[in-house]
Amino acid sequence: MLHYSVIFFVIALIAAFFGFSGIAAGAAEIAKILFFVFLIITIVSLVAGIFHKR
């Protein structure tokens, strides 16, 4: 699960880059939302992975 969240976070970063740079102005809002959603998912997965190993 952590592996997938990192992959989706990278995809969100790429989408955010295109959205924030004006290349795809129509998709900027979607990229911003995806960036923060996957950032939260990544943090939750990292914390869950740390506590699961104990």
From Swiss-Prot:
HAMAP family: UPF0391 (MF_01361). The keyword DNA-binding does not apply. One of its GO terms (cellular component) is plasma membrane. Keywords: Cell membrane, Membrane, Transmembrane, Transmembrane helix. It is found in: Cell membrane. Signal peptide: none annotated. This is UPF0391 membrane protein Mfla_0947/Mfla_1091. The keyword Cell membrane applies. Pfam families: DUF1328. Belongs to the UPF0391 family. The chain crosses the membrane at residues 6-26, 30-50.
